[in-house]
């Protein structure tokens, strides 16, 4: 049985900058970046066998996003969006020799690891068909996570560390949709 406790006191500081640019009705661009620092006042002992850490877990120092929308003709809209998530410290629980003997995961100690950073890019195209005066039928399609920015080192098996998950929530995905507005 594992019990989790809140950590000791902490200091979080940061800055967020955002901006938006538009050219007529054809082009819009919005972007933002957050720079932050999160530290415990005293080193936090998250596992009996791992070194204590002052840096907070799962809090990247840098995060950013952008959205660009282009409307070359009135019924067609093309949107490009991206999210940057900087490297962050994450916990990875130990796998005991007993659990490793089951053959699913090798034995390892509890460690705090720095993740890679991720850039997640997506694109969507939408075309509106207008019916009557106020009904719009939209067809859309796109790709999410074009560059397959996704965690590569998941634990596997019944004794995996189910909390060892970081990065974008979904792998590369293709989608299509229909929207009716009235």
Language-model features, listed with the residues they occupy:
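Gram-negative outer-membrane beta-barrel transporters
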Residues: 3-94
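Conserved C-terminal beta-signal and adjacent last beta-strands/turns
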Residues: 54-182
